A protein has these predicted regions:
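Phosphate/diphosphate ligand-binding glycine-rich loop within oxidoreductases
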Residues: 1-7
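Mid-domain Rossmann-like dinucleotide-binding core that forms the NAD(H)/NADP(H) cofactor-binding site
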Residues: 10-86
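Alpha-helical segments flanking ligand/cofactor-binding loops in enzyme cores
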Residues: 52-53, 73, 115-118, 143, ...
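Local beta-strand N-terminus motif with an aromatic residue
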Residues: 80, 101-103, 145
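Short amphipathic alpha-helix with an adjacent loop that forms part of the alpha/beta core around
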Residues: 89-100
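N-terminal Rossmann-like NAD(P) cofactor-binding module of classical short-chain dehydrogenase/reductase
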Residues: 103-106, 128
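Glycine-rich phosphate-binding loop and adjacent beta-alpha segment
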Residues: 112-178, 213-214
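C-terminal hydrophobic helical "lid"/dimerization subdomain
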Residues: 163-215
Length: 215
């Protein structure tokens, strides 16, 4: 879109596109800010951090889940109303359903986190799934689906039609465009990439990184 520079588009990248698709899918299921908070797992990651910022811009209350509690202030600056340790979502344990704690959720990590987000989503709510950093598998009962009408929504940012990609990029360039966008992406050189990949594998990175191949 004309309203985005090339660098701004790369700050969003696939992760930002996935975040925008996740928010849009919740909207299509009827999500509104007045329904209650949206939980976001993997909050300091590329998808999670942009999801928080977009949701906040659209007026939603956000509960951020992260293992990096030292990043609490950063997450609140992005727009999180509350920051909780990621493992607190699993306190529901083996129970088939838990207390209804959020209206909707965006899950970026999979595994038991996805299952337990679903168990604690309010009746009629939805949870999007776009990642598997924790696990590609999860186990739960069907009770959240058949007793609360909770929906599990898959997010695909690769094989969706180009018309859909065009539509969501237009929203990213308009009502979903974040102010001071460059603060969401740290620019690094191509030579620094191996170092940052090591940090990523050690779970020591936060947010988005843009590689300047000419730097």
């Amino acid at each position: 879109p004309d309203a985005l520079t090339l660098k701004e588009a790369m700050i969003y990248g696939t992760g930002g596109l996935t975040a925008a698709l996740s928010v849009r899918k919740l909207e299509k299921m009827g999500a509104k800010p007045e329904h209650g908070p949206v939980a976001v797992s993997g909050a300091t990651g590329g998808v999670g951090s942009i999801s928080i910022a977009i949701l906040n811009q659209l007026g939603y209350e956000v509960i951020a889940f992260s293992g990096k509690t030292e990043q609490t202030e950063h997450l609140k600056e992005l727009g999180a109303s509350e920051v909780r340790h990621r493992d607190s979502v699993n306190e529901v344990g083996k129970r088939p359903v838990g207390r209804e704690l959020w209206a909707n959720a965006i899950d970026t990590v999979g595994g038991e986190y996805l299952a337990n987000l679903l168990k604690q989503t309010k009746a009629g709510g939805a949870v999007t799934s776009c990642g598997l950093a924790a696990s590609a598998e999860f186990s739960m009962t069907v009770l959240p689906f058949i007793t609360r009408g909770v929906s599990l929504l898959g997010i695909d940012s690769v094989f969706i039609p180009l018309t859909d990609k065009k539509d969501i990029w237009q929203r990213v360039a308009t009502d979903m465009k974040l102010p001071d966008l460059e603060k969401y992406g740290e620019e690094i050189t191509l030579e620094q990439t191996p170092e940052y990949l090591d940090r990523f594998m050690a779970s020591k990175t936060v947010g988005r990184y843009v590689v300047n191949v000419r730097g």
